[in-house]
């Protein structure tokens, strides 16, 4: 089974995806980690690489290509990504969207990154604005349209263990088509 975990910065998607992958003994791939690795190799931070990516679709294509390779190769995989739910939906069995209000996400990011709450809010707003523009421009998707997701969870008042339990309960309650996934070249988009 291939499962997508999407959501905005600070929603808990990476933590949940890692824990879920461990619970299921699935492989895990993170678009955010791939993006951060690209930023580091270019000597940039995430915000500045997002700025570069606004005019250079090759950045997103590199991330997408790496994820696409995993999706076609692996049978038991958790994909963590802001936009995988939209662009890889046809290849996956279940798409889950995690979210929380801005103030909660900012608090989580401030603690995680050891920055002020105000700086975390500023970073989130900048990243989300850049993501919205870029993903609409290059992919033609509206990241506010959550209709592609099977399950949407507000992570505000649920701890990680209960979020994972909720997802596991959902997974056990649905049946999936086990036919092989079709190959498609995502670079044709």
UniProtKB/Swiss-Prot annotation:
- Annotated GO CC locations: cytoplasm
Q: Which Gene3D superfamilies match?
A: P-loop containing nucleotide triphosphate hydrolases
Instruction: Tell me yes or no: is Kinase among this UniProt entry's keywords.
Output: yes
User: Taxonomic lineage of this organism?
Assistant: Archaea, Thermoproteota, Thermoprotei, Sulfolobales, Sulfolobaceae
Q: Which family does it belong to?
A: Belongs to the cytidylate kinase family. Type 2 subfamily.
List, alphabetically, the InterPro entries matched: Cyt_kin_arch (IPR011892), Cytidylate_kinase_dom (IPR011994), P-loop_NTPase (IPR027417)
> Which EC numbers does the record give?
2.7.4.25
Tell me the name of the encoding gene.
cmk
Q: Does the keyword field hold Cytoplasm?
A: yes
Query: Which protein, by its recorded name, is this?
Result: Cytidylate kinase
Task: List the molecular function annotations (GO) for this entry.
Answer: ATP binding; CMP kinase activity; dCMP kinase activity
GO biological process annotations for this chain's record?
pyrimidine nucleotide metabolic process
Q: Which UniProt keywords apply?
A: ATP-binding, Cytoplasm, Kinase, Nucleotide-binding, Transferase
Residues that, per the record, bind ATP: 7-15
Which Pfam family, any one, appears in the UniProt record? Cytidylate_kin2
Give the catalytic activity: CMP + ATP = CDP + ADP; dCMP + ATP = dCDP + ADP
Q: Where in the cell is it found?
A: Cytoplasm
């Amino acid at each position: 089974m291939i499962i997508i975990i999407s959501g905005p910065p600070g929603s808990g998607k990476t933590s949940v995806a890692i824990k879920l992958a461990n619970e299921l003994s699935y492989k895990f791939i993170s678009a955010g980690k791939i993006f951060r690795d690209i930023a580091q190799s270019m000597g940039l931070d995430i915000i500045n690489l997002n700025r570069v990516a606004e005019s250079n679709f090759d950045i997103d294509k590199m991330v997408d290509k790496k994820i696409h390779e995993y999706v076609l190769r692996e049978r038991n995989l958790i994909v963590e990504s802001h936009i995988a739910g939209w662009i890889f939906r046809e290849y996956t069995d279940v798409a889950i969207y995690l979210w929380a209000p801005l103030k909660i996400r900012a608090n989580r990011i401030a603690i995680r990154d050891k920055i002020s709450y105000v700086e975390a809010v500023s970073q989130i707003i900048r990243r989300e604005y850049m993501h919205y523009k870029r993903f609409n421009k290059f992919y033609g998707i509206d990241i506010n349209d959550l209709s592609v997701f099977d399950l949407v969870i507000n992570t505000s008042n649920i701890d990680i263990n209960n979020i994972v339990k909720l997802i596991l309960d959902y997974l056990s309650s649905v049946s999936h088509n086990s036919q092989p996934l079709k190959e498609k070249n995502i670079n044709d988009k």
